[in-house]
């Protein structure tokens, strides 16, 4: 009523009326408080008044009472001697409630610790007959029976699992997929579930809690904790849950850490230490850069490398923003470098912004460029507004505004970080990156085709403003992303001639402060060494020495364009900032097609804005798929049958349509109208029928005329010999009657023996064959009859009703189950969905490969050799006679004695985590169905049933067995490929036999396993003189080639209207074959006839009817029940379906019901309680040619012929009237002939 609530303040004593009051007191304006805060404050005060204290009663009206003066003696004593303050009462720990205690007891009984070195490292829980143990938790389960179980590894979920012993299966926790938002229980209290994330207050839970279950109020497991990450005041948990189909799902927040108690150890100079606590704490990169890089290199393969890197980078840094601190400070361990660029705008050169790699695997034209310059970093720290590059031997920083990227036109910079640039570029064949440094301009161009990759089935060229969201690939800035690294190492030696000078006729090596220099001198003996201070050699010419500045305080990218350092060099790694991830992108939505319906014809008027894909398939046994790109406005026609047609236009969802038995004419009209009606429905059959009728009529007319004419001539021949002889009409008719005479059996056999002995023996063998057949039937009856009767008896005792229903979703099966002495019970079974779940075996995963080219080893004035390394498709080759230069200066003394060892191998690209294909072998599977059942008063009970003919399903008190399918069919071949959300039948090569340039050239069992196989035809080439690089040739990616030529998925070409789903791999709702059903209905569902309501004066009248339509029939049923109550209607025919099966009947009135039928003349028996009536009528064809639901159709021509058509047909070819007319015609013809002959 009011915009703000009235506050109820606590009662106060009334103001003394005799006290002095200002006649004009200032108005005190109460501070404004929002309505919600006011309500909360009001509620708090009310609760405080009611529960916390009892307020004193209000003083009576009048002057205030006099206050007593305090005694002075007491105040002095109080000042002198104060009592000690009372001891603070210790707060009692709140006891857990009943619900929490129950969950704690369940957890303690079903959760077992995992022991490692005498301490608890994590937990394993028993759920649903299996024991689950986190894979990252090492140790042994503290239970003898569970510890003896052989566990299977599921690395994708970071779990190990195994079946518990039979004696423990009854005492396990149950899981549930229902997770409504709210609070759940675990060992440390409450867990909040909101926005699909489990969170706890920060500081609750941590190392050692991995494997603990999260329970709901009923004690069911909703998740298993594996780790967590701090997010502000709360901690987000990394958990494993289950979806609605019982499939395990892993939910890991970004940056989560496993919560195993065991600390992963790292190593440095044979000393082990916790990876998150380096030994020289607070030893940081800023204090000891070389030692820090060495420590990281020695722990390159440690699974706690990220913790060590984080500790080394941030150990003395002040608190900053989390994303900036985690990401950008890592690259302070690296520096830019100068490398070879194939095209610097004029020719090949050594560029400070050389392009290492260009990746364009994201959608919407976004590319990622890796260069030799660095972005977002200055020489001494992080600054997003700057970029740094090598200006000769020194590092220089400039504003990022000087950077430019272009293809065929300038690109838009999206982000930059480390060595990487993220840009959105127009299509082009080359990528150019450059910057301006005052008057100097540095560019590098690389041949790379950039394309705008649209999402979905429409080839748009620019990101749309609005449309539909579809899955796509994007580059994102992920924090501490496991598995996406860029490989680094300490740079090799770089010659610096500025360090050499002539001093007192000798070559002097000048060492910068705090640096080391390695030198080679040949005068005439070769001398080499490392010095950290100025050094004078015995050489007299600068050309006789080479000086190399040792830079061991920074990493550089492990590039094939830089020489590798001498000796055994270790490698480091940093996180790739822009990693590909799955995301949602806006795709265009083509204008809806203008649809026109004709008889069994669908006409689509299409008006695409850009090339749009149109696919169609039939929903019958022959899919007959079509696939075409529509680039301009056009009109397409498709034939639609009763089996249905599915078409998909662009990014719109697929639509299914069915043809109705519509047509011109009327099956209940005159002959020409009936012919028009059937000609539209069955043109070929109608033409054949009409031709047959015409032929029968012509033969019927010609044959009697010719016969009568011949018989007349025979009859009047004797009279022609006598002149003026007249034949009476009656005699002429009697002459036409052919005389007959019957022979006995002996005469017939005698005739056959004398004239046709073959036919004689045939006639004799017929009785013998009949006798043999009868004897065989009697023998089979006595032998197999009792067993057959026993089987039938057992079947009848086990199941009340058996039938066969079509395997079509949405079309119900209806029947009437009768028992003697009981009223019939209506039974309805409807398939909600069907699933064929095959047994699959994942052979391997394939994806796009990435060629890794390490820095080459250049051996000056000597030879080197290759060693084998366990890398897929590893290639190594030594080239002699190389003469490399480094930024304009010679790298080696010798001219032809130098050697270079080039290496290259293949690894997974970063996109493999989101863009890969899985190769499966598919075997025979099981069929499951969800059915809705109605019997008697029990309505719509749903159940999941195995369609195998063996496994029963309980539905209420009824027992149902369905199956097996009449046709063991599956849309899958023996080998299928799953790519994204689509499935393809493809005969892929076996594991380990992939060929270069084809599907399977890169294979691994999982997306993270080390069993990588590759065959890419990688060949190393000889490097060019004067350039440090590693040229090679290689076959194009077979995975990318397969993606271009993969064809249409099974969702577009599978027959019988199958829909292909994943997790697990299965086809759904395939309308193939039929399903036997057997149901045992309990006795409680039947009603005795004496207790059944009675209805009298039944009369059924069909007022309107349209066959093959969705409840197109309307019938009226006048009723006069004994008493007003709800009764049930039962139809005895399967082809008639009632829309409503129960209805209240009044004392005197009528009931109108809708029904669906496929017959032209519906005639079905309708039973109301114990009374029955037959409903008959005529139905007209539907007016709608095409509908969006499956309609019922007659399957044979004879059942589709109306009674009117049969009547006209009988009249034409064989009715009684036809014989009468033909007899009259014959009589008239004979009479006319005799009359004209007489005269």
From Swiss-Prot:
Segments carrying the region annotation (Interaction with the capsid protein) are 710-714
Q: Which UniProt keywords apply?
A: Capsid protein, Cleavage on pair of basic residues, Disulfide bond, Eukaryotic host gene expression shutoff by virus, Eukaryotic host transcription shutoff by virus, Fusion of virus membrane with host endosomal membrane, Fusion of virus membrane with host membrane, Glycoprotein, Host cell membrane, Host cytoplasm, Host endoplasmic reticulum, Host gene expression shutoff by virus, Host Golgi apparatus, Host membrane, Host nucleus, Host-virus interaction, Hydrolase, Ion channel, Ion transport, Lipoprotein, Membrane, Palmitate, Phosphoprotein, Protease, RNA-binding, Serine protease, T=4 icosahedral capsid protein, Transmembrane, Transmembrane helix, Transport, Viral attachment to host cell, Viral attachment to host entry receptor, Viral ion channel, Viral penetration into host cytoplasm, Virion, Virus entry into host cell
| Result for mutant: residue 478 to A | Complete loss of interaction of EEEV strain FL91-469 with host receptors LRP8/APOER2 and VLDLR. No effect on EEEV-PE6 strain
Output the PTM entry: Structural polyprotein: Specific enzymatic cleavages in vivo yield mature proteins. Capsid protein is auto-cleaved during polyprotein translation, unmasking a signal peptide at the N-terminus of the precursor of E3/E2. The remaining polyprotein is then targeted to the host endoplasmic reticulum, where host signal peptidase cleaves it into pE2, 6K and E1 proteins. pE2 is further processed to mature E3 and E2 by host furin in trans-Golgi vesicle.
Name of the protein in question: Structural polyprotein
Q: Where is this motif: Nuclear localization signal?
A: 66-69
Q: Name one GO molecular function term.
A: structural molecule activity
Q: What else is known?
A: Belongs to the New World alphaviruses that can cause fatal encephalitis. Structural polyprotein: Translated from a subgenomic RNA synthesized during togavirus replication.
Species this protein is from: Eastern equine encephalitis virus
Spell out the residue ranges making up region: E1 fusion peptide loop.
882-899
Result for mutant: residue 226 to L = In strain: PE6 vaccine
Q: What residue spans carry the Pro residues bias annotation?
A: 23-34
Chain intervals for the UniProt region annotation (Necessary for nucleocapsid assembly and virus assembly): 1-35
Quote the catalytic residue positions: 136 (charge relay system), 158 (charge relay system), 210 (charge relay system)
On the tree of life, the source organism's domain of life is Viruses
Q: Which residues form the Peptidase S3 domain?
A: 110-259
Glycosylated positions are 49, 270, 637, 932, 1069
Q: Which Pfam families match?
A: Alpha_E1_glycop, Alpha_E2_glycop, Alpha_E3_glycop, Peptidase_S3
Annotated Gene Ontology cellular components are: host cell cytoplasm; host cell nucleus; host cell plasma membrane; membrane; T=4 icosahedral viral capsid; virion membrane
Q: Which parts of the sequence are annotated with region: Disordered?
A: 1-101
**Disulfide partners:** 266-275, 280-284, 283-315, 341-444, 344-349, 411-425, 472-585, 521-545, 523-539, 715-736, 847-912, 860-892, 861-894, 866-876, 1058-1070, 1100-1175, 1105-1179
Phosphothreonine modification sites are 111
């Amino acid at each position: 009523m009011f915009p703000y609530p009235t506050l109820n303040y606590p009662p106060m004593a009334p103001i003394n009326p005799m006290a002095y009051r200002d006649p004009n007191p200032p108005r005190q304006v109460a501070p404004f408080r929002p309505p919600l805060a006011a309500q909360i404050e009001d509620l708090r005060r009310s609760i405080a008044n009611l529960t916390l204290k009892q307020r004193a009663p209000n003083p009576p009206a009048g002057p205030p009472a006099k206050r007593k003066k305090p005694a002075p003696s007491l105040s002095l004593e109080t000042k002198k001697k104060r009592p000690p303050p009372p001891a603070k009462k210790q707060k009692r720990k709140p006891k857990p409630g009943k619900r929490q205690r129950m969950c704690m007891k369940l957890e303690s009984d079903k959760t077992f610790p995992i022991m490692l070195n005498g301490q608890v490292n994590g937990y394993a829980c028993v759920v649903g007959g299996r024991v689950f143990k986190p894979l990252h938790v090492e140790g042994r389960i503290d239970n003898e029976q569970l510890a003896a179980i052989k566990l299977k590894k599921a690395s994708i979920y970071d779990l190990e699992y195994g079946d518990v012993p039979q004696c423990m299966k009854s005492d396990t926790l149950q899981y549930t997929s229902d997770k409504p938002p709210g609070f759940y229980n675990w060992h440390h209290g409450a867990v909040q579930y909101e926005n699909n994330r489990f969170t706890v207050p920060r500081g609750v839970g941590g190392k050692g809690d991995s494997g603990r279950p999260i329970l709901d109020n009923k004690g069911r497991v909703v998740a298993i904790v594996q780790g967590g990450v701090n997010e502000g005041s709360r901690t987000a948990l990394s958990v494993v849950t289950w979806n609605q189909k019982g499939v395990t799902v892993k939910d890991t927040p970004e940056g989560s850490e496993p919560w195993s108690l065991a600390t992963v150890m790292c190593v440095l100079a044979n000393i082990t230490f916790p990876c998150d606590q380096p030994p020289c704490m607070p030893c940081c990169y800023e204090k000891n850069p070389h030692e820090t890089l060495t420590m990281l290199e020695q722990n390159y393969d440690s699974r706690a490398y990220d913790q060590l890197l984080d500790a080394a980078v941030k150990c003395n840094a002040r608190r900053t923003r989390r994303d900036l601190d985690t990401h950008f400070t890592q690259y302070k361990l690296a520096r830019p470098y100068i490398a070879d660029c194939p095209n610097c705008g004029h020719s090949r050169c050594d560029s400070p912004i050389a392009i290492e790699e260009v990746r364009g695997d994201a959608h919407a034209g976004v590319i990622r460029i890796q260069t030799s310059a660095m972005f977002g970093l200055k020489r001494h720290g992080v600054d997003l507004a700057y970029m740094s590059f090598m200006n000769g031997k020194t590092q220089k920083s400039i504003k990022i505004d000087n950077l430019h990227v272009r293809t065929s036109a300038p690109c838009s910079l999206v982000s930059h970080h480390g060595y990487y640039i993220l840009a959105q570029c127009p299509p082009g064949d080359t990528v150019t990156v450059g910057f301006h440094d005052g008057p100097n301009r540095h560019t590098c161009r690389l041949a790379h085709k950039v394309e705008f990759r649209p999402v979905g089935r429409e080839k748009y060229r620019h990101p749309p403003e609005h449309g539909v969201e579809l899955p796509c690939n994007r580059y994102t800035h992920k924090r501490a992303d496991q598995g996406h690294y860029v490989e680094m190492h300490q740079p090799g030696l770089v010659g610096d001639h500025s360090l050499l000078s002539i001093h007192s006729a000798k070559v002097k090596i000048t060492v910068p402060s705090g640096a080391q220099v390695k030198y080679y001198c040949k005068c005439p003996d070769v001398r080499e060494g490392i010095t950290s201070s100025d050094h004078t050699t015995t050489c007299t010419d600068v050309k006789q020495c080479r000086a190399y500045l040792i830079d061991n305080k920074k990493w550089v990218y492990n590039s094939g364009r830089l020489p590798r350092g001498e000796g055994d060099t270790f490698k480091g790694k940093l996180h790739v900032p822009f990693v590909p991830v799955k995301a949602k992108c806006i795709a265009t939505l083509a204008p809806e097609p203008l649809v026109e319906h004709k008889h069994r014809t669908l006409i689509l008027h299409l008006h695409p804005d850009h090339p749009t894909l149109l696919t169609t398939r039939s929903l019958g046994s022959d899919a007959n798929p079509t696939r075409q790109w529509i680039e301009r406005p056009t009109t397409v026609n498709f034939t639609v049958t009763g089996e249905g047609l599915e078409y998909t236009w662009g990014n719109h969802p697929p639509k299914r349509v069915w043809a109705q038995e519509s047509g011109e004419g009327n099956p209940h009209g005159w002959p020409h109208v009936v012919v028009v009606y059937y000609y539209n429905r069955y043109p070929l059959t109608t033409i054949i029928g009409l031709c047959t009728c015409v032929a029968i009529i012509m033969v019927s007319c010609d044959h009697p005329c010719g016969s009568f004419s011949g018989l007349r001539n025979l009859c009047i021949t004797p009279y022609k010999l006598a002149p003026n002889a007249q034949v009476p009409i009656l005699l002429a008719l009697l002459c036409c009657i052919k005389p007959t005479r019957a022979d006995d059996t002996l005469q017939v056999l005698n005739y056959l023996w004398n004239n046709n002995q073959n036919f004689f023996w045939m006639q004799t063998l017929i009785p013998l064959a009949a006798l043999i057949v009868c004897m065989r039937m009697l023998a089979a009856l006595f032998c197999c009859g009792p067993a057959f009767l026993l089987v039938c008896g057992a079947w009848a005792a086990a199941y009340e009703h058996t039938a066969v229903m079509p395997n079509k979703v949405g079309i119900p099966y209806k029947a009437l189950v009768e028992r003697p002495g009981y009223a019939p019970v209506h039974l309805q079974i409807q398939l909600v969905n069907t699933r064929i779940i095959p047994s699959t075996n994942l052979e391997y995963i394939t994806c796009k490969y990435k060629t890794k080219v390490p820095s080459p080893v250049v051996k000056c004035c000597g030879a080197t050799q290759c060693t084998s390394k366990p890398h897929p498709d590893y290639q190594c080759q030594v080239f002699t006679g190389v003469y490399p230069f480094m930024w304009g200066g010679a790298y080696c003394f010798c001219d032809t004695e130098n050697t270079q060892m080039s290496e290259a191998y293949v690894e997974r690209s970063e996109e493999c985590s989101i863009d890969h294909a899985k190769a499966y072998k598919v075997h025979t599977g099981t069929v499951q169905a969800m059915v809705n059942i109605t019997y008697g008063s029990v309505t719509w009970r749903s159940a999941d049933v195995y369609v195998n003919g063996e496994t029963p399903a309980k539905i209420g008190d009824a027992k149902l067995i369905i199956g097996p399918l009449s046709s063991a069919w599956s849309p899958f071949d023996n080998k299928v490929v799953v790519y994204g959300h689509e499935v393809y039948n493809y005969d892929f090569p076996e594991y380990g036999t992939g060929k270069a340039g084809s599907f399977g050239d890169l294979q691994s069992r999982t997306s993270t396993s080390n069993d990588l196989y590759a065959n890419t035809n990688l060949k190393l080439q000889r490097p060019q003189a004067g350039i440090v690089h590693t040229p090679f040739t290689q076959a194009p990616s077979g995975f990318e080639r397969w993606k271009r030529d993969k064809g249409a998925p099974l969702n577009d070409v599978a027959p019988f209207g199958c829909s292909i789903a994943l997790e697990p791999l299965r086809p759904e709702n395939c309308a193939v074959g039929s399903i036997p059903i057997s149901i045992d209905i309990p006795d409680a569902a039947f009603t005795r006839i004496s207790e059944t309501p009675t209805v009298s004066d039944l009369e059924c009248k069909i007022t309107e009817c349209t066959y093959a339509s969705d409840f197109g029939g309307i019938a009226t049923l006048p009723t006069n029940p004994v008493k007003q109550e709800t009764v049930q209607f039962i139809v005895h025919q399967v082809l008639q379906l009632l829309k409503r099966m129960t209805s209240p009947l009044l004392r005197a009135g009528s009931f109108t019901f809708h029904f669906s039928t496929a017959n032209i003349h519906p005639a079905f028996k309708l039973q109301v309680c114990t009374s029955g009536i037959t409903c008959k009528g005529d139905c007209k064809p539907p007016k709608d040619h095409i509908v969006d639901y499956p309609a019922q159709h007659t399957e044979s021509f004879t059942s589709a012929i109306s009674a009117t058509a049969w009547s006209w047909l009988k009249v034409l070819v064989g009715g009684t009237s036809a014989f009468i007319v033909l007899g009259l015609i014959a009589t008239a013809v004979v009479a006319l002939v005799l009359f004209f002959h007489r005269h």
